[in-house]
């Protein structure tokens, strides 16, 4: 499994549920080549469910520089390949718990492009500050323990 891109902003802006889903993406050949060289952006992208089908919106895949023929829209809506029971499960959670679905990372699994998605709830500003404080405190503790162990 080779990770191409991770949506780091998602971990900061959203509180994620533990269950994550793996979805395939319906792409063109030149889009796959472009993803392979890392020309992809997940910022501001989200998953939209319509008519029992899942779509990813605002995922930007830049044009492959060596492609001669196919011109495509870089921000086009792409269909996600999920099992029907997973789509129904996600749709029910969105309705009942007021959650949103966001992409976490894009990776290759046996030469197939996969997308890891998760249900999430947006964090408020004070929650983001508290998360940063906790992270800084953990870093300080690790540094002091490391220095203490080196002195002995």
Swiss-Prot record:
Matches recorded under Pfam families: SmpB
Classification via SUPFAM superfamilies: Small protein B (SmpB)
Keyword Zinc included in the entry's annotation: no
Alphabetical list of Gene3D superfamilies matching this protein: 2.40.280.10
Main location, first listed in the record: cytoplasm
InterPro entries assigned to the protein according to its UniProt record, in alphabetical order: SmpB, SsrA-bd_prot, SsrA-bd_prot_CS
GO cellular component, as recorded: cytosol
UniProt keyword list: Cytoplasm, RNA-binding
Localization: Cytoplasm
Entry keyword annotation includes Transmembrane: no
Coiled coil: none
Gene Ontology molecular function: RNA binding
GO biological process per UniProt: trans-translation
Stored PANTHER family: SSRA-BINDING PROTEIN (PTHR30308:SF2), TMRNA-BINDING COMPONENT OF TRANS-TRANSLATION TAGGING COMPLEX (PTHR30308)
Matching NCBIfam families: PRK05422.1, smpB
Entry similarity comment: Belongs to the SmpB family.
Entry-linked HAMAP family: SmpB
UniProt function note: Required for rescue of stalled ribosomes mediated by trans-translation. Binds to transfer-messenger RNA (tmRNA), required for stable association of tmRNA with ribosomes. tmRNA and SmpB together mimic tRNA shape, replacing the anticodon stem-loop with SmpB. tmRNA is encoded by the ssrA gene; the 2 termini fold to resemble tRNA(Ala) and it encodes a 'tag peptide', a short internal open reading frame. During trans-translation Ala-aminoacylated tmRNA acts like a tRNA, entering the A-site of stalled ribosomes, displacing the stalled mRNA.
Name of the protein: SsrA-binding protein
Organism the protein comes from: Onion yellows phytoplasma (strain OY-M)
Organism ancestry: Bacteria, Bacillati, Mycoplasmatota, Mollicutes, Acholeplasmatales
């Amino acid at each position: 499994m080779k990770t191409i891109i991770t949506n780091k902003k998602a971990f900061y802006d959203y509180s994620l549920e533990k269950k994550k889903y793996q979805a395939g993406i319906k792409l063109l050949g030149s889009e796959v080549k472009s993803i392979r060289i890392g020309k992809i952006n997940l910022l501001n992208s989200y998953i939209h469910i319509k008519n029992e089908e899942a779509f990813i919106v605002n995922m930007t895949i830049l044009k492959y520089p060596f492609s001669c023929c196919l011109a495509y829209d870089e921000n086009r809506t792409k269909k996600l390949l999920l099992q029907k029971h997973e789509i129904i499960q996600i749709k029910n959670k969105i309705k009942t718990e007021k959650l949103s679905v966001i992409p976490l990372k894009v990776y290759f699994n046996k030469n197939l492009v996969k997308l890891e998605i998760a249900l999430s709830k947006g964090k408020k500003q004070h929650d983001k500050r508290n998360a940063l404080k906790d992270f800084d405190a953990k870093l300080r503790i690790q540094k002091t323990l490391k220095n203490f162990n080196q002195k002995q």
